Every structure is written in C-alpha cells, then in structure tokens.
Amino acid sequence: MRPTFRKLEVKDIGHLEKLVADNVEGVEPGLKVVDSRLLLGHAAIDLVGLDSRGSLALIALDFTADEGLLLRVMDAYSWCLEFPDTLRRLYPMAQLSTARPPRILFIVERLTDSFLRRIKQLSFLEIDCFEFRHLEVNGESVVFFDHVERLRKAAA
C-alpha cells in the first residue's frame, strides 16, 4: 500500500507554536522548549529553547519570513546582549556568556531569498532557518522541519 500525503492547514501562530513545541526534537535532537511568549524589551519571542549543549535558543515563528520578523528578532537579541544578567536569572540552566550568546532559530512556512540575503549580513553568531510542513501521512498528523540555512560566525 502506498503512503498517502495531504498538507494540513496551520490556522494561526498559536497553533504553529503548539506544533513546534510538541515536535521540537524534529528541529534538532536534544532541543527542549523552556518558555514561550517571552517579552524581551519591546520584542516578543515565541519560544525559548535549550539545546543539548546548554545554549539558549530564541525561536521565532511566522508563516512568512519578512522584515517584521527580522526586526523583532534583532530587537530581542539586542536586549539579550544588553541585559545578560537578567537573562541568566531567567534561565540559570543555560550556558550564557559574551562568547556564547543565544542562538537564533527562525521557523516559518516560507523563507524568501531576500530574507536569507539579509540574515547573512547580520553579526549574530548562530542562526538557523527552517521551513515547516504540517502533513497528514496515512491518516497521522506529522510535522516536518526542513533545515534551509545554517550560519555560523567566529566569536570575536
């Protein structure tokens, strides 16, 4: 019998947040969600993760990668760099330092070429971009994460 596939609709950001949180191991083995809907300065981060190395990951979710998403993450990331002690108090289990700031993960339905060009110009140490697919496979709901871009810059 052949497998059957059908794309499922993700209704809103809240639904996407739950799908990602419930399936975060599909993004990266060892990644755990430790917080959600965190306000960092004036910017909201959808999910906060902790990876297998103990690094904090700011996870931004949306349907399309656009300037608004990029600016929101830049604002949140800047706040993290400006107030590292507050971040350490919020997440004492995380390994945070100037040499090891939070990672950035974008999880969107569609990444544009212009978005990828822009993030390559940023000075974040670690950025990962994923596209998600919510599918029904043989009657079962599954979420697939396609790792589209990984950027790593040397620490100063």
Please state what every model-predicted region is.
Residues M1-A156:
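Charged, terminal alpha-helix-loop-beta segments
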